[in-house]
């Protein structure tokens, strides 16, 4: 059992800023996200698209914004639970909140901040009978597990977007796999030009094989409960079928949002969004706050900068609830206390305890 003052569900831009604002209040946080990396849809869907309405930043991409937020958050050393879904959330007799994840972790928190956007983004899966047997051993969605050894193995990356191309290119450049194939329904990929040029160079050198076609079946060996994936049956544009040997399959098919069990946690909702007050962005369940696109209130605007405002007020409210007293307003420009929390040298003229 992990006991903590705060859990933030969702590691998109608003969730990251929520953890930062909690850090300024001296509150450590655990961050949980369904994706294998921080950033939410800001990275996964809009990583290379420009954002023009973040205060003080004339323009940045979604990925650049997340990189800046992660750097800003770094001094507070949050605890990460990535590739993880919250399966259950329930108030306890002592007013704390018990969270259970799909990985088996249990967290007992004094406050919970839901920054889940339009829901937990989960990978789109292959809709093919029998594929589920290989998930986590030979079949992986979106990314390979960190540190996985593919030496001497035949790896197929299935997908046509930037994530798929990047995965195949990285594997080929590492040079450990016996063969790297990029499988997609057509020989046209959606990725930045620089990445496509790397792909072309690797193709020309014979280090990546691009396979055009669609998966229609699989070949495996062994008993059903302990079988091994051996090959994919693929049909090309001309209708010809052939087998592609495979040891490791990485399916990069995009992601889709899912509210999941959130609707069962007893909070008041309207049109699939959590109803909150505008003083502290509290939900109808004590100790649970909701910020960003997941919440709704009169005048709501689904903008990142509005989520930053909500996260700030929620952090102040939670700090007062946890400490049982009003929280003094301090400024990062002058507060020696905040400078110590941030690990920065005091500015000239800084004051405070």
From Swiss-Prot:
Binding residues annotated for FAD, in chain numbering: 33, 41, 46, 86, 121, 293, 333
Organism: Verminephrobacter eiseniae (strain EF01-2)
Acyltransferase found in the keyword field: no
Cofactor: FAD
Organism lineage string: Bacteria, Pseudomonadati, Pseudomonadota, Betaproteobacteria, Burkholderiales
Catalysis: reaction(s): 2 reduced [2Fe-2S]-[ferredoxin] + NADP(+) + H(+) = 2 oxidized [2Fe-2S]-[ferredoxin] + NADPH
Alphabetical keyword list: FAD, Flavoprotein, NADP, Oxidoreductase
Alphabetized InterPro entries for the sequence: FAD/NAD-bd_sf, FAD/NAD-binding_dom, Fd--NADP_Rdtase_type_2, Ferredoxin-NADP_redctase_2
Family of this protein: Belongs to the ferredoxin--NADP reductase type 2 family.
Protein name, entry field: Ferredoxin--NADP reductase
UniProt entry tagged with the keyword Ribonucleoprotein: no
Record's subunit section: Homodimer.
Record-level Gene Ontology MF annotations: ferredoxin-NADP+ reductase activity; flavin adenine dinucleotide binding; NADP binding
